[in-house]
């Protein structure tokens, strides 16, 4: 495939990706909290309605996560994010945006590190392959509801999968970096993502 053809098919692939995501985001306006969304978000919802203080909500989410850690399960980082789900602020639709955005950006980021930094592919080759990969990942999702529309369920899968892709990108960046300062920053970000 020559450069002109690659440019055309890359543009078409990006357009198809955007067109396929728009209805998914549009549908999200009709979502509402469900099942575990209420369990994990109840305390934060109460605090938000009483104080409208985001720092107080973060503290409450931390308390929910610690309670879950000590009494039920050790997935404290997920429990923290589930307690802060957008539905407690009346913006449940934001969950779909967060989940799709994290999946798209993390996939593009990892493939950038692999294709551009390790394999030295051209920008167009990277964009084409990355776009196809993201398109297939989204289109062949087994359950859209569990992956993008049910915030608490998708936290464990879509968001943490995306975070693992970001972590892999950071680890590649760490190996490629010769700067001690950059390595220290990457180390810190890797600890947060781990």
Residue ranges and their predicted role:
Residues 1-21:
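Start-transfer (signal-anchor) and selected internal transmembrane alpha helices
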Residues 125-175:
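Membrane-interface micro-motifs in multi-pass membrane enzymes
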Residues 184-194:
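Membrane-interface alpha helices of multi-pass inner-membrane proteins
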Residues 98-124, 166:
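Transmembrane-helix motifs of polytopic, lipid-linked glycan transferases
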Residues 2-4, 112-125, 176-184:
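Membrane-interface helix-boundary motifs at transmembrane edges
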Residues 63-90, 94-97:
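Short hydrophobic/aromatic helix or loop-helix immediately within or flanking a transmembrane segment
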Residues 93-102, 153-161:
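Alpha-helical transmembrane segments of polytopic membrane proteins
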Residues 27-50, 54-60, 69-81:
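Extracytoplasmic catalytic/substrate-binding loops of multi-pass membrane glycan-assembly enzymes
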């Amino acid at each position: 495939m020559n450069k002109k053809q690659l440019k055309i098919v890359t543009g078409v692939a990006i357009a198809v990706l955007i067109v396929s995501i728009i209805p998914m985001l549009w549908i999200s306006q009709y979502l509402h909290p469900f099942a575990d969304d209420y369990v994990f978000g109840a305390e934060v919802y109460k605090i938000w309605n009483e104080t409208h203080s985001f720092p107080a909500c973060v503290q409450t989410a931390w308390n929910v996560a610690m309670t879950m850690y000590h009494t039920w399960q050790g997935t404290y980082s997920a429990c923290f994010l589930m307690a802060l789900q957008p539905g407690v602020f009346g913006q449940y639709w934001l969950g779909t945006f967060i989940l799709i955005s994290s999946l798209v950006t993390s996939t593009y980021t990892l493939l950038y590190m692999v294709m551009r930094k390790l394999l030295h592919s051209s920008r167009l080759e990277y964009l084409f392959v990355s776009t196809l990969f993201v398109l297939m990942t989204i289109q062949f999702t087994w359950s859209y509801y569990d992956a993008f529309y049910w915030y608490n369920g998708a936290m464990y899968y879509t968001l943490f999968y995306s975070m693992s892709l970001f972590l892999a990108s950071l680890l590649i960046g760490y190996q490629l970096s010769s700067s001690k300062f950059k390595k220290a920053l990457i180390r810190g970000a890797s600890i947060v993502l781990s």
